[in-house]
UniProtKB/Swiss-Prot annotation:
NCBIfam families: rpsB_bact
Gene3D superfamilies according to UniProt: Glucose-6-phosphate isomerase like protein, domain 1 (3.40.50.10490), Helix hairpin bin (1.10.287.610)
GO biological process: translation
Protein name in UniProt: Small ribosomal subunit protein uS2
Family: Belongs to the universal ribosomal protein uS2 family.
GO molecular function term, any single one: structural constituent of ribosome
Species whose genome carries this gene: Francisella tularensis subsp. tularensis (strain WY96-3418)
């Protein structure tokens, strides 16, 4: 099946109602159907391919991709696909400063690791019941917000965002730090300042699944390529 047909099947072409449109998205709109903007997939296909290729190249060069999707219908998909390809993710709430104040975030990640170790080795059980429950609640709270980035080990090389409106703070932080931004941009969104714009439906579960599967597959393929290059380098060194 062609990429265009896959996008049609996933409903990528359905935008928002005309009343909510952002005029800056005009060049990516094909027309209107029953008051809803239809996205021009002839524009989306090459832009999406460019974005997927960029993600693959970044990973092949040893880079990290941070997937961001905190809206209800994106949460489970973003988490599952990011885990499948071994990349960090934020799927519940974007903490202000998650990128721009990463040093502080890193301290919270260390705290989470310490508490998890205490739970695993039984240290928590030696505390009073009140202290134990407080620490368990802290673990749950930190895990929910930071669980997806606790293995990130530093700032990402790029972020992939589902819904540029919802995740505008994440985008602003990435831009401030010179981190490349890949984003699904619907007809009600502002495409300005996004490095890799993907005009498309950012609400439908089918569309979100389509994007995330393609990105995760690109990461997995690139990781295989990266490992093959490393193996060749090792062989050359031993020769």
């Amino acid at each position: 099946m062609s990429l265009m047909k896959e996008m049609l099947s996933a409903g990528v072409h359905f935008g928002h109602k005309k009343a909510f449109w952002n005029p800056q998205m005009k060049e990516y709109i094909f027309g209107i159907n029953h008051g809803v903007h239809i996205i021009n997939l002839e524009k989306t296909v090459p832009l999406f391919q460019d974005a997927v290729n960029f993600v693959g190249k970044t990973v092949a060069n040893g880079g990290k991709i941070l997937f961001v999707g905190t809206k209800r219908q994106a949460q489970d998909i973003v988490e599952a696909e990011a885990k499948r390809c071994g990349m960090p993710f934020v799927s519940h709430r974007w903490l202000g400063g998650m990128l721009t104040n990463y040093k502080t975030v890193r301290q919270s990640i260390k705290r989470l690791a310490q508490l998890e170790k205490m739970r695993e080795d039984g240290t928590l059980e030696s505390l009073t019941k009140k202290e134990m429950l407080q620490n368990i609640r802290t673990i749950e709270k930190l895990e929910k917000v930071l669980g997806g980035i606790k293995e990130m080990g530093g700032l990402p090389d790029a972020i992939v965002v589902i819904d540029s409106n919802k995740e505008h703070i994440a985008i602003q932080e990435a831009q401030k730090l010179g981190i490349k931004v890949v984003a699904i941009v619907d007809t009600n969104s502002n495409p300005e300042g996004i490095d890799y714009i993907i005009p498309g439906n950012d609400d439908a579960v089918k569309s979100i699944s389509f994007y995330m599967k393609k990105f995760a597959d690109a990461v997995i393929d690139a990781q295989g390529l990266d490992r093959a290059v490393e193996a060749k380098a090792d062989e050359a060194a031993q020769a």
